[in-house]
Swiss-Prot record:
SUPFAM superfamilies: Glutathione synthetase ATP-binding domain-like, Succinyl-CoA synthetase domains. NCBIfam families: PRK00696.1, sucCoAbeta. Keywords: ATP-binding, Ligase, Magnesium, Metal-binding, Nucleotide-binding, Tricarboxylic acid cycle. Pathway: Carbohydrate metabolism; tricarboxylic acid cycle; succinate from succinyl-CoA (ligase route): step 1/1. It holds the Pfam family ATP-grasp_2. It comes from Pseudomonas syringae pv. tomato (strain ATCC BAA-871 / DC3000). One of its GO terms (biological process) is tricarboxylic acid cycle. It catalyses: succinate + ATP + CoA = succinyl-CoA + ADP + phosphate; GTP + succinate + CoA = succinyl-CoA + GDP + phosphate. One of its GO terms (molecular function) is succinate-CoA ligase (ADP-forming) activity. This is Succinate--CoA ligase [ADP-forming] subunit beta. Belongs to the succinate/malate CoA ligase beta subunit family. Its cofactor is Mg(2+).
Amino acid sequence: MNLHEYQGKQLFAEYGLPVSKGYAVDTPEAAAEACDKIGGTEWVVKAQVHAGGRGKAGGVKLVRSKEDAAAFAQQWLGKRLVTYQTDANGQPVTKILVESCTDIAKELYLGAVVDRSSRRIVFMASTEGGVDIEKIAHDTPEKILKATIDPLVGAQPFQGRDLAFQLGLEGKQVTQFAKIFTGLAKLFQDHDLALLEVNPLVIKADGDLHCLDAKINIDANAMYRQPKLKGFHDPSQDDPREAHAAKFELNYVALEGNIGCMVNGAGLAMGTMDIVNLHGGKPANFLDVGGGATKERVTEAFKIILSDTNVAAVLVNIFGGIVRCDMIAEGIIGAVKEVGVKIPVVVRLEGNNAELGAKVLAESGLNIIAATSLTDAAQQVVKAAEGK
């Protein structure tokens, strides 16, 4: 689960980390009032969405009057912000963060992820702050410094000092960086995070370090341990199809192709997408109906897939285990009839009672193409999507 910047900074403040004074507002009037509360003559206003690249898209602005802050809020609240990290529809803006302006001397990067290979939390730091860290990692990997956290003892101040020296920090900055480093590590572990970024971590004109941004992603599998953070969830940022799918325990991720995919099992779903790509097609989604491919779940899956107007054909790839293929076939037929599917549907059944399932499909009288293998299914659905 992603957090907004203002929510991340709330957590930072709880751990004693240096953040700007600011307020998250949802009206132009509140934006103007926030400027008065903060004081000063310059403020930064930021549209709050779960995506990076806001500055280049016009979602971050320096303002010098509370009227300009209100105008910015009026411009963005209720609108959708499109960045290089969103789809063409963008993300809705329901909050604006109004902050005090920070005089920046230098930008750094500090982040942490769970590294699967080492099975540890790994911190990354770089002198190249304020830019896309993935680009730095690709172009100049030597500029990324790393520190691995031992889960038995946690982050140690000496690790923070070591990173600080390598970043070229000096004097009080070394102590400040070590405090930020250990604070972020404790926050990461306490709240079961999957990713944390401060980009940029800045050196202010007075030489002090300051967390100018906050990006946090919480491990969805650990949310049951984080009841406090459940209240931070912003449903407006969810893809409506993904949110609807979750209600029926369907794992759905929207993509940008035109071939809908319905599969039971995450591994088989990924393999199905790969083979569709291999044969020249582009999947419109990842959809795992799980082990219980019942008529009800298949029906909802079809509804979700067909809500994407780009979908030109659907590939159903089911491996029958405990649930027999003939029962799955009957569920598919019932779902196709109920939903009123008008586009071609290619079905590949394998496993328990696969032959009987294929027979049931063939005798249905519906526009359902029974595939003989996974390769055949991919070839058939690509042709169908192309109108051949």
